[in-house]
Regions:
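Short acidic helix/loop segment immediately C-terminal to the autophosphorylated histidine
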Residues: 14-21
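Short conserved segment of the HATPase_c
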Residues: 142-155
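Acidic ATP/Mg2+-coordinating residue in the GHKL
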Residues: 137
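Short beta-strand/loop element within the Bergerat-fold HATPase_c
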Residues: 119-129
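Short helix-loop "hinge" at the ATP-lid/N-box region of the Bergerat-fold HATPase_c
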Residues: 111-115
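Glycine-rich ATP-binding loops of the HATPase_c
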Residues: 180-186
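Conserved catalytic submotifs in the C-terminal HATPase_c
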Residues: 59, 80-92, 190
Length: 203
């Protein structure tokens, strides 16, 4: 486990007189492991917070503005990533602002970290039935037979990198359910994966 690996590295540092280069390498492993554990705990906290959310917490959310901000923030977080927003009329739904933003952020992070994407496209289409939010990427994609399983907690696709908590898409699925909708992975016209979030119109 990550904690076991961290303990082993710390014991090596405590008991062996390593050359500077090896010492830096072990310290780097410790820092990377700590970062992974911290990300897992943070994701678990967000899952717990989501389970405590109620309909009373839902407010009007401008999806067009939310996607625009997510695009700009993602390009700051991931240098070299191109994120575009498909122009559309203002789209407002009733929902959880933080939860919807978390969904988009996690979809982008998943595309970059596990799919190696260099381009992401965000879009939202509104109708009487509700709204469809799509996050498309040009990454390596997710095999069709794994697209349902990767939404489960701690699940990892065969194309996923070794880093990560295995909770990113579980959080997406949770938020979709909290909004009475669904989340699914599809083929993207960009060549990678499309995360499609379908949210129903208010009753």
């Amino acid at each position: 486990t990550p904690l076991t690996a961290m303990r082993t590295n710390l014991e090596v540092l405590a008991t062996l007189d390593l050359p500077d280069e090896q010492r830096k390498e072990v310290l780097g492993d410790v820092i990377r492991t700590q970062t992974r554990i911290e990300a897992t705990l943070s994701a678990l906290e967000r899952l717990a917070q989501g389970e405590l959310s109620t309909e009373a917490d839902q407010v009007p959310v401008d999806i067009t503005e939310l996607l625009d901000r997510a695009a700009h923030d993602a390009m700051r977080v991931y240098p070299g990533l191109e994120v575009s927003l498909v122009p559309s009329p203002t789209c407002i739904i009733i929902g959880l602002p933080a939860g919807l933003r978390l969904t988009v952020d996690n979809a982008i992070a998943n595309a970059v970290k596990h799919g190696g994407a260099t381009r992401v496209q965000l879009s939202a289409v509104s109708s009487r039935a509700g709204v469809e939010i799509a996050v498309d990427d040009n990454g390596s994609g997710v095999p069709e037979d794994e697209r349902h399983a990767v939404f489960e907690r701690f699940a990892r696709g065969s194309t996923a990198s070794r880093s990560g908590s295995g909770l990113g898409l579980a959080l997406v699925a949770q938020q979709a359910e909290l909004h009475g909708g669904t989340a699914a992975l599809e083929d993207s016209p960009l060549g990678g994966t499309r995360l499609m979030l379908r949210l129903p119109a208010p009753r």
